[in-house]
Amino acid sequence: LTVYFGKNGEGFADVEFSIYRIAEISQDGSYTLTGDFKNYPVNLENLTSSGWRALAQTLDAYAARDHLQPLQVKKTGQDGQVVFSGLSTGLYLVKGEQYEEEGHIYKPEAMLVSLPALSEDGGWSYHQKVYCKFDSPETSSEFVHRKE
């Protein structure tokens, strides 16, 4: 699994990413929570794209709250890519640390990635490349004063 984190073709280097295996995948493509995630009260069925996004955020929050240990932790190279290898089939939570550049903070959104995934030709793809979505609120050195 290759994860890319960058903007306008420029990769963000030296950003730490963690990966967690959250579910097993069956022959019919359904998921069953596993490991540290098996007792969390979440639904993995009939999700829309916004539902998958919300699920990733929820599982990210559980992992942080419960101090779960990731399966692997790696940093992006100069090209903004990090490769997680040796992964078995299943559903994975991928989360990254923020990156700061020229007064902007880029925080990658947690995401869920299935291995294998359905490829464009309808077959199964075991070699995925995913691109991080991110929020980039501006940082400021000015203080905001609130009137009392």
Each predicted region: which residue ranges?
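Solvent-exposed loop/turn and edge beta-strand elements of beta-rich ligand-binding domains
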Residues: 1-148
